[in-house]
């Protein structure tokens, strides 16, 4: 089970949001590159970046911070990024900078054909992020809940060639309320590609539950507030996950 530290970028700083609300941002660091190095030194084997401003603007907004992070750690571990990725040109620019994978979120739900085009243009490099409230996909920085069920979308995107799905339960993200294991497993059981859990990770019991779900296709978990506020020691948690594999 791979634990993936999240670095959410807002105006060049590392922050965490509650339930995707920009006004509910807590600043954890003014140096995202130092934060990235910290998690690498703690044993992280992959990093998850989110351009929060980009997610709302629809175009990249935190390029200097992203470049600094890649300069600091991309030679050692893969880095993935989502937020504001709406066209093939942006994907190409990001991959040229040194990102390992890009995550398509809102654009995937609004324009599913874009996912197929991206997978053809950049095979093996595309992840789809599905954010859900009560099983229904949410878009535009979680501002809008659609009528599309995430399971139906995941099946389509698997057929299009995405390498994995990141599943976020937006009712739990940043709330320290525990992972929605049942919903994550249900999604993972419907597709053959890996599913990464995101949102709600609070303690080592969540790690144990996720590791037990690994046999169903849950391949990893993105963790944010818990490791920044200290309810989870990242190095200890990854060691636990490794021991349970």
Swiss-Prot record:
It is found in: Cytoplasm. Belongs to the HisA/HisF family. Keywords: Amino-acid biosynthesis, Cytoplasm, Histidine biosynthesis, Isomerase. It is an enzyme of class 5 (isomerase). The active site is at residues 8, 131. GO terms for cellular component: cytoplasm. Its EC number is 5.3.1.16. The gene is hisA. This is 1-(5-phosphoribosyl)-5-[(5-phosphoribosylamino)methylideneamino] imidazole-4-carboxamide isomerase.
